[in-house]
């Protein structure tokens, strides 16, 4: 079975290594691969796995066939609105660093379709399940915003202050999901609380960016910081914000 992976970065190749181990024929497409034509990579694919940076998704979607099942592994998407024209899409997300997946360390993720679980499950890679595609995508984006604030506050893992922060941030994410036609319970899955715990500390790029901001207000990173992109989209009104979210209010006030 051929599976096309769009995005040959660390996470895309980590997922590809699992699929190859399970006997799938993998074909990658990446903007850096000038020799590859997207149409050739997608030809005869039974599934497409989307692993490109979130900012690239709107530019790529018009060229992806709408009738091939699409597995969204990109994080940083605030809603699933851009996928409304696709006949069959599902989401894979959660607290998994690519290096840990490649090393076959124990990793737990969230899937929104049994086919994702069937394709990717290994003894070292396990899943919980929800059919809340929008909620899973939102969790994968919002946790990056809160990780920036954790870095700005200098919170250290496993301290009482860190636990309090993660608990409050997760409650706020649940409220945001409920206010945007998603399931608040999704925040309690691996894609929610699990990924939040992983991201609110080093070596998370979002957390690291927050530590820099604490000393250099307005600092603009050279590399993509998904939490900063998401925060700017939130400030533009791309999702509904209920009242009573002090942590989100604080971090948005600190970001340009």
Q: Could you describe each region identified by the protein language model?
A:
Residues 1, 24, 68-69, 86-87, ...:
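A structural micro-motif
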Residues 1-47:
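NAD(P)+-binding Rossmann beta1-loop-alpha1 motif at the extreme N-terminus of oxidoreductases
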Residues 4, 26, 137, 178-256:
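NAD(P)-dependent Rossmann-like dehydrogenase/reductase catalytic/cofactor-binding core
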Residues 8, 12, 57, 78-80, ...:
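Generic structural signal for well-ordered, non-membrane alpha-helical segments
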Residues 12-15, 42-106, 116:
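Rossmann-like NAD(P)(H) cofactor-binding subdomain of soluble oxidoreductases
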Residues 22, 63, 88, 106-186:
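Internal alpha-helical scaffold of NAD(P)-dependent oxidoreductase catalytic cores
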Residues 72, 88-93, 127-131, 188, ...:
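General beta-strand structural signal in soluble alpha/beta enzymes
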Residues 75-77, 93-97, 113, 131-135, ...:
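Glycine-rich beta-alpha junction loops
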